[in-house]
């Protein structure tokens, strides 16, 4: 293999630049040329492809976002559109592709693989919802961003004796909410994977108030429903002074944590190794702190699951 491509797709996550850097430097170390594909699959279709050198990825390991930009490209689901992308890859002499992104990005890589073009997926999403890996690139940074925000909100919640409902990202996965809620001692954590009884939530808040608790923190993953509606329901049912904070896209930004930089470097380099070995159609991950790779088609057939023990622990510690 003499030439590979790399792209980032879907929602950005802190650490993507570190992964790009690792792909480029690992490949060049093995005398392989690297081409960056800008704006994800949309740039692949349009041919926005440029050669990357060592200097192209200098001074980016500590930067959030993605140097290659990103975009969503629903039209890539069309086989004819994907063929245009493959034509662009072949036009530039690219023999293998590293795709950094989340579930949708993996779906694109899977489809390209099924159409005969070797791809390796690298998990880049703050949601931590990709099967085949314990952690995704960006999750740790986003988690620390959320924890920092909740710490600050707790200060003002204490001062004003208020209940705060804090919405975090996670349409289908509650990892951010669960980990942040446990780390910050939230009174209640609501996630898409677990059903909840609003009356039970209210009863828990009332019990806390009866024993002298002056404030409460409720962490809600966006996939559960409207945090605003939940806040209104709580205030009406308890008469507690209640506020709602939606953290939004601040969770996707910022300089990546040390953990995300190291994880991205390891996974990006491993993706190149797989392409060199002729092992396309794979996705890389980290499990028990060891690098692993899986068939991308088989990985996508799996379902992300929440850590049930951690969820139970969060309930036991929030009594």
From Swiss-Prot:
The active site is at residue 127. GO terms for biological process: canonical glycolysis; fructose 1,6-bisphosphate metabolic process; fructose 6-phosphate metabolic process. Pathway: Carbohydrate degradation; glycolysis; D-glyceraldehyde 3-phosphate and glycerone phosphate from D-glucose: step 3/4. Its main location: cytoplasm. It is found in: Cytoplasm. One of its GO terms (cellular component) is 6-phosphofructokinase complex. Induction: By salt stress. Its cofactor is Mg(2+). One of its GO terms (molecular function) is identical protein binding. Mg(2+) binds at residue 103. PROSITE patterns: PHOSPHOFRUCTOKINASE. It catalyses: beta-D-fructose 6-phosphate + ATP = beta-D-fructose 1,6-bisphosphate + ADP + H(+). Keywords: Allosteric enzyme, ATP-binding, Cytoplasm, Glycolysis, Kinase, Magnesium, Metal-binding, Nucleotide-binding, Stress response, Transferase. Pfam families: PFK (PF00365). Belongs to the phosphofructokinase type A (PFKA) family. ATP-dependent PFK group I subfamily. Prokaryotic clade 'B1' sub-subfamily. Catalyzes the phosphorylation of D-fructose 6-phosphate to fructose 1,6-bisphosphate by ATP, the first committing step of glycolysis. Homotetramer. NCBIfam families: PFKA_ATP, PRK03202.1. This is ATP-dependent 6-phosphofructokinase. It comes from Bacillus cereus.
